[in-house]
Structure formats: structure tokens, C-alpha cells
Amino acid sequence: MAMWLDSVPQLKSLGVSNAEIAELTKAHEAGMTDPSSVVLIQLARDHKTPFADGQSVADLLNAGSSEETVLELARLNQLGLWAGEARAMRLAGLSDKMILAVARRRSQGLPVLSGEKLGELKNTGVTDAMILQMIQKGDTDETATKLIAQLERAAGGHRFVYQAHAHR
């Protein structure tokens, strides 16, 4: 076992494989704490799969997502392939709250805006509160495209990028 894992007896009792240790090491090196590492393994056991999302966890943490957000994504079984989109959303300035709202809808099989459209909404100057409301209502990419077009027309027909801080 990796040296840091020797100090986490709960992991030994969960029968962690060498492959899972390698994945946990990636997450740990990105800042995942020991107690959360145990939770990740327990969640993988609950989903009856080996833990294989260490790189996804590391990428999300490195993009600025909180450990709590990563654990909630794991609870929702939304790490895996979707974690890349969640990471891109985070890097585009979307909050963990928005990412979790999208993940909850995805986990329930409900319609949800794509990460790309959410980023466009953010860049067009739509407030976080309005974006969150659109996610929770189940607005589609088509609805978002119409809103973006309206906002661009109102701005004189130009695509523009919202900047939170004026540069002089």
C-alpha cells in the first residue's frame, strides 16, 4: 500500500485493490483528504464497482471544485465520463452549486442544459441565480440559445463576453 494509505485502517477493511490504490493516490495528490478517500471507496462499493475515478476527482479538485462537491458527484454516480464536462464547466466559471444542480438532474434522467450552453449563458452575462433557475426548471439548450440570441440583439447584435471586472 502507498505510505499514506497505511494510516487509514478503514481502507484496509474495505479490501482496496492495487488499481484502486493507484486511483486514490491521484485523488490524494490533488488534495482529497483521508476521510473522503474512505467515502469514495465506500461509494464505489455501494455502486458495486471498483473505484476507478481518481483522475476525475483530481481534475475536479484542480479546477476548483470543493471536496464536498466531488463526494456529492460520487454519491450521484456522476464522476466517470461526465466529470470532464463538469471540470470544463468549473473552469468556465460555473459554481459548484450549478454543477451539482446539473448532476442531480442528469442522475434522475431529467432534461438539463449542456455544459457548453451553460458556459455561453455565463459569458453572455446571465446571472448565476438565473442560470441556476434555468437548470432547476429543466430548460433545454434550445431555450438557452433563444435567450442568448435575445441578449445579443439587445446588445446591438454583437456577440460579447461578459467581464465581471472592468479593465482600464
How should each PLM-predicted stretch be described?
Residues 1-168:
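General marker for long, soluble alpha-helical cores
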